[in-house]
Regions:
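Membrane-interface alpha helices of multi-pass inner-membrane proteins
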Residues: 288-304, 309-310
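Start-transfer (signal-anchor) and selected internal transmembrane alpha helices
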Residues: 1-107, 210, 321-322, 335-356, ...
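Interfacial juxtamembrane loops and adjacent helix segments
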Residues: 111-212, 386-453
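Membrane-interface anchor segments at the N-terminal boundary of transmembrane helices
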Residues: 53-65, 201-218, 418-505, 533
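Specific aromatic-rich, kink-prone transmembrane helix
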Residues: 220-227, 264-282, 294-296, 535-539
Length: 582
């Protein structure tokens, strides 16, 4: 049997070495399997010491600091011995990225800084997974979080079966019955006759093991983002610098400890972007297209809003399709035969794409509609009135506010209004851009202790970064009109910029409309627009490059200050997550 397969339709495709590709897949599977085991080992070794030294999470944080010191020592040593290369630096960054994610998971109980995981009525994400684990069936209602597609809950349920078997071995063979689960129930909600009914210590422990999966989702996303940056033709130390931004972006760290469906959804969104760009830039190979379809379908099976990523991907498909039609028309005029076969082949590939993506991504929507009458795109909206933000006008909520309290009144997100005897005594945060900034750094939580010197400075640098990036974009427009064609990018770069712009705009507009439809503080959370992290990184990279190419005194100063502020924001938030507690 031949070791290569190819398409006879596209001449610029294609030949893939099946053997080489197979071993590459095996290497990645082996790597992530090994990291899962390592993460599990640290989970079982260090979670019992969560409150050691009378400070929550200190042991895990010390471990991470030691790891960072070792990585810095290795980097300095390699630099002095002239063995440092961009590839080695990138590997050190990725290792550090794994370490900070592992540490955050070890420092954060499964009930802390989560989204809709535990609730008093037992209709959150934890109960969703537990129902599948204990019954093998979907919930009988679509209450609260049960309206979501089941992929995240299903994977967690399967993983709990694995950890349940492992626990039985640890208890019976190694005599750890006194340790498990009693040492793994930090921050467990208090069970009463009315609240958290059915929650036991063992159930709480078992679900907490799914944080191991969250670390892996975040790590896989991290790798996918770095590989995507390579597809944008970033190389050398530039690639390492931009990779450091996406690796250490604070919400990526938080996702490593959060067990709702956001991390899994985001992972599949970034994988779909990666395989779409591979298809686009590396010969339009069919298997890249099919993997992209699978990732989109699985993302929608975790959370239907994953479909937003279809907008930039669909634009790529449409662009290539119409470009192929244009080629076929030109070839027909020149008397060439068979030109339309390529168009037909591409159309067939797109149909195959839909045949994979649509059933996987939409079957639950059909099931929920037939079972519960749940409409497509349904979002649970029976929210706590204290989350409402209609106490301020639409302009202040959506664009700019001149209320100093919204800027400086709170460091972290204030999600709920304070209401006493039916009277609001303190309003929550309501401005969308500011809430997005705060939640991009710290989530929508204010349950942090310690590290305020880092978090406060990070917020200030982050706010300044946004202002400076906006000025950079305006300055790029000025340079374009001033220098004309000298500022034009080449065709591949224009395609990259167009894709990034469409992707970023798709999510920001989606979030904008979401907040208009549901004016609550929780709908402003940055977790709904996570793919814009890649967009921001690339927009900053391109703007910085264009301004430096112009070589003006103002532009160079602007680039220096903005780069410093962005680097400071990422560095300070990383330090913050190394020292903060619950």
């Amino acid at each position: 049997m031949s070791e290569t397969t190819s398409s006879s339709v596209f001449s610029d495709n294609e030949r893939i070495n099946v053997k080489e590709y197979f071993f590459k897949v095996v290497r990645y599977v082996g790597l992530f399997a090994a990291l899962t085991i390592i993460t599990g080992v640290f989970f079982y070794l260090l979670k019992p010491y969560y409150e050691f030294w009378n400070r929550k999470g200190a042991v895990a944080q010390c471990l991470c600091v030691v790891g960072f010191i070792v990585l810095i020592f290795v980097g300095v040593y390699c630099k002095k011995t002239k063995e440092m290369t961009p590839d080695l630096l990138l590997k050190l960054i990725l290792i550090a990225g794994y370490l900070i994610r592992l540490t955050y998971m070890l420092c954060t109980p499964v009930s802390v800084r989560q989204y809709d995981t535990y609730n008093r009525a037992s209709t959150g994400h934890e109960t969703y997974a537990w129902i599948i684990y204990s019954t093998g069936k979907l919930p009988a209602t679509n209450d609260y979080q049960f309206y979501h597609p089941p992929l995240n809950a299903f994977v967690q349920a399967m993983f709990m079966h694995v950890t349940n078997g492992l626990t039985e071995i640890l208890q019976k063979v190694f005599g750890l019955g006194d340790v498990i689960p009693s040492k793994y129930i930090a921050a467990m909600p208090k069970v009463t006759d009315r609240y958290y009914v059915g929650l036991t210590e063992y159930r709480y422990y078992l679900y907490s093991t799914t944080q191991i999966l969250s670390v892996m989702w975040s790590v896989i996303t991290m790798v996918a983002l770095v590989k995507t940056l390579k597809l944008f033709c970033l190389k050398g130390y530039t690639l390492a610098a931009v990779s450091a931004f996406v690796v250490f972006f604070p919400r990526h760290i938080e996702f490593a400890g959060q067990v709702n469906n956001d991390a899994l959804t985001y992972m599949f969104q970034m994988l779909s972007v990666y395989y779409c760009l591979r298809w686009w830039k590396r010969g339009r190979r069919l298997y890249d297209l099919l993997i992209c379809a699978l990732c989109i379908g699985l993302g929608m099976m975790a959370k239907i809003s994953a479909a937003v990523i279809c907008i930039p991907i669909g634009c790529v498909f449409a662009y290539e399709f119409f470009r192929e039609i244009g080629k076929a028309v030109s070839a027909k005029k020149n008397g060439e035969s068979g030109a339309w076969k390529k168009v037909g082949y591409m159309a067939a590939c797109y149909v195959l794409f839909l045949c994979i993506c649509a059933p996987i991504g939409l079957w639950f929507q059909v099931y929920a509609y037939k079972t519960f009458g749940q409409k497509l795109g349904f979002v649970f909206s029976n929210l706590n009135g204290a989350l409402g933000t209609t106490h301020h006008n639409w302009f202040e909520r959506l664009f700019i506010t001149f209320d100093p309290n919204e800027y400086f009144g709170t460091l972290y997100c204030q999600t709920f209004c304070t209401i006493k005897d039916g009277v609001t005594t303190h309003y929550n945060n309501y401005n969308l851009p500011l809430f997005q900034l705060r939640s991009s750094l710290f989530g929508e939580f204010n349950t942090y202790k310690g590290g305020e010197c880092f978090s406060a400075t990070a917020f200030a640098c982050g706010l300044l970064s946004l202002i400076l990036v906006f000025i950079m974009l305006v300055y790029c427009i000025v340079l374009f009109f001033k220098n004309g064609k000298k500022m034009l990018a080449d065709e591949p770069e224009r395609k990259n910029i167009a894709f990034i712009a469409i992707m970023t705009a798709s999510f920001l507009i989606s979030e904008f409309m979401f907040y208009i439809k549901m004016p609550y503080a929780c709908t402003m959370d940055f977790r709904y627009v996570m793919p814009v992290i890649l967009g921001f990184a690339m927009i900053f990279y391109y703007a910085r490059r264009r301004i430096l190419a112009a070589n003006t005194e103002f532009g160079n100063a602007l680039v220096f200050v903005s780069t410093f502020c962005v680097a400071a924001t990422i560095s300070l938030t990383t330090l913050f997550y190394l020292v903060c507690s619950v």
